[in-house]
């Protein structure tokens, strides 16, 4: 059984996942205000988001290698402290470039945080609760999508966008104190150097999961990056129903993470079959479902559930197939690859919208989702079953 202290630590880590992802999403809802304040275009203000993702992608691995020898509780506290400092810098930024610098600092903290939070959550709980720990971390991300961005936007609209960053910084500081008090020391599992990377990549199944992490993220964000204009222009939903649909989308992600904790360990192969086929099916049927408000809302609900479930599967198998001393580094590689997939998916979706039609974004994503499903079934699943027999 889980002790109260385990639960309290896990809830604290889930809240940390919520606040880090809220911070990542926040500028999306504040771009117009930021652009107006600094007398720039929204496109220029949008570079804050693009550069943030690029920094996370580029620095996840090298930063994690540098800090891999540190005790994990102390490392987490330091990362949140840096996060708080740069949030406060965002709140007092007097120029576009000062804000950009502060967001780069937040991105560096983000890169390390997402490399350690899942391994830390797994090590905080008893063995039988590992799936629950991972699902709760991803639930924090889903809740950020549902509530974090809207709350941040409301704060920004009423008392200024700077106050949004200030509130995030204050919340994170309180959370840092809480985690310092409640978390037990979690020793590092050894240093990791660049010389060990070739050995890590010789872990065949791990490399396969890195590959499909990229293809899943790319296929998903080919469609999801443009879901708002798709719902408006193709499905013909009104603004209030678009908001409702996106909230349902995120809320069903919580159900997906709970489904993982309940069913994945019982039959990981069938569960992964279901979520990968679900992603393919949702993308393939996106245009057809747009004929009716009810069908597109139901499709988005299923899409949110299966994608979130697939994300937890990828994180779980990245940890399961990594050497004990390299789990945090493996997660940093996963984070970088996933962010690359986000960038590629957004680019592909944009090209489809430009050269074909917005109604075709689902088909473009479905092609890659189908290739992912075939790769999983013909290669990865076979290797995992052979490995299970050998063990």
Language-model-derived ranges and their functions:
Residues 98, 127-181, 226, 230:
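Helix-loop-helix hairpin linking two adjacent transmembrane segments in secondary transporters
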Residues 112-125, 309-323:
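Intracellular juxtamembrane helix-capping segments at the cytosolic ends
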Residues 102-140:
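Cytoplasmic helix-loop-helix junction between adjacent transmembrane helices
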Residues 59-71, 256-268, 353:
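Helix-to-loop junctions at the C-terminal end of transmembrane segments
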Residues 321-358, 365:
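A late C-terminal transmembrane helix in Major Facilitator Superfamily
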Residues 82-89, 97-105, 294-302:
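Paired small-residue
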């Amino acid at each position: 059984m889980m002790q109260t202290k385990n639960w309290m630590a896990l809830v604290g880590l889930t809240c940390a996942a919520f606040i880090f992802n809220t911070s990542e999403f926040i500028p999306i809802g504040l771009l117009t205000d930021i652009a107006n304040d600094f007398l720039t275009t929204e496109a220029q203000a949008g570079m804050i988001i693009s550069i943030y993702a690029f920094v996370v992608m580029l620095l996840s691995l090298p930063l994690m290698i540098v800090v891999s020898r540190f005790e994990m509780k102390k490392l987490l506290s330091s990362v949140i402290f840096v996060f708080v400092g740069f949030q406060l810098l965002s709140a007092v930024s007097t120029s576009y470039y000062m804000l950009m610098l502060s967001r780069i600092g937040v991105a560096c903290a983000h890169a390390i945080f997402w490399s350690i939070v899942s391994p830390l959550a797994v090590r905080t709980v008893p063995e039988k609760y590992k799936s629950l720990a991972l699902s709760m971390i991803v639930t924090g991300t889903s809740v950020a999508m549902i509530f974090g961005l809207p709350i941040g936007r409301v704060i920004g609209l009423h008392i200024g966008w700077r106050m949004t960053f200030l509130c995030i910084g204050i919340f994170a500081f309180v959370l840092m104190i809480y985690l310092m008090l409640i978390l037990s020391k979690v020793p590092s599992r050894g240093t990791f150097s660049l010389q060990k990377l070739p050995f890590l990549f010789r872990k065949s199944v791990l490399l396969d999961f890195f590959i499909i992490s990229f293809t899943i993220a790319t296929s998903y964000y080919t469609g999801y990056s443009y879901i708002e204009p798709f719902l408006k222009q193709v499905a013909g939903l009104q603004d209030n129903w678009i908001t409702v649909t996106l909230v349902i989308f995120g809320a069903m992600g919580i159900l997906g993470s709970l489904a993982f904790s309940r069913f994945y360990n019982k039959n990981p192969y069938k569960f992964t079959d279901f979520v990968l086929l679900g992603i393919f099916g949702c993308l393939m049927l996106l245009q057809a479902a747009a004929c009716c408000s009810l069908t597109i809302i139901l499709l988005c609900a299923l899409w949110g559930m299966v994608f979130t479930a697939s994300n937890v599967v990828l994180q779980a198998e990245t940890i399961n197939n990594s050497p004990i001393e390299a789990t945090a580094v493996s997660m940093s590689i996963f984070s970088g690859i996933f962010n690359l997939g986000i960038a590629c998916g957004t680019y592909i979706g944009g090209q489809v919208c430009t050269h074909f039609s917005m109604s075709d974004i689902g088909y473009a994503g479905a092609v890659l989702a189908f290739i992912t499903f075939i790769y999983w079934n013909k290669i990865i699943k076979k290797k995992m079953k052979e490995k299970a027999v050998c063990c």
